[in-house]
Amino acid sequence: MALVPVVVEQTSRGERSYDIFSRLLKERIIFLGDEINDVTASLLVAQLLFLEAEDPDKDIQIYINSPGGSITAGMAIYDTMNYIKPDVSTICVGMAASMGAFLLAAGAKGKRFALPNAEVMIHQPLGGTRGQAEDIRIHAERIVKLRDTLNKILVERTGQPLERVQKDTDRDFFMEAKEAKEYGIIDEVISSRK
């Protein structure tokens, strides 16, 4: 069981306690600090929709420290980030790998950041299937189509030519924060709010 810190606030009605993530949500901050799967995607999508309903004109920040995960779950988050009215700023703390890196790049242009010692890793989709030959062929075609879709979006988000994105995502491609900026995945490396 994960330990979640509690924050206590004084209000006119007494003390109020929040888990740290609920308190951050009040400040329009979402933390993606786990593998991306259907559960984390549902929670993140719900938080994005809630914050849009609260104030459709105020930016939302997503802090990312994720090894990546499910493509379909990640695309649910990506589509929602683009669907809602507020700009979504993304900040990499630690590591944004695979779908985590994709979501980092999906932030609003000019509002994608990484801390100085953060790392970013992109690669092609991973897949594995068992079964009859025809089923394996169907899954292989699907994963190639997903790879092409992800690469096309990375081209749009980074400004890199398709050939470079295809080459770089063929295997694990690691970048330090400054390299992720040069690549176009983020817009700035930030070290302080001062």
Swiss-Prot record:
It is an enzyme of class 3 (hydrolase). Its EC number is 3.4.21.92. InterPro entries: ClpP, ClpP/crotonase-like_dom_sf, ClpP/TepA, ClpP_His_AS, ClpP_Ser_AS. It is found in: Cytoplasm. It comes from the Bacteria. It catalyses: Hydrolysis of proteins to small peptides in the presence of ATP and magnesium. alpha-casein is the usual test substrate. In the absence of ATP, only oligopeptides shorter than five residues are hydrolyzed (such as succinyl-Leu-Tyr-|-NHMec, and Leu-Tyr-Leu-|-Tyr-Trp, in which cleavage of the -Tyr-|-Leu- and -Tyr-|-Trp bonds also occurs). Keywords: Cytoplasm, Hydrolase, Protease, Serine protease. The active site is at S98 (nucleophile), H123. CDD domains: S14_ClpP_2. Its main location: cytoplasm. Cleaves peptides in various proteins in a process that requires ATP hydrolysis. Has a chymotrypsin-like activity. Plays a major role in the degradation of misfolded proteins. HAMAP family: ClpP. This is ATP-dependent Clp protease proteolytic subunit. It comes from Alkaliphilus metalliredigens (strain QYMF). The gene is clpP.
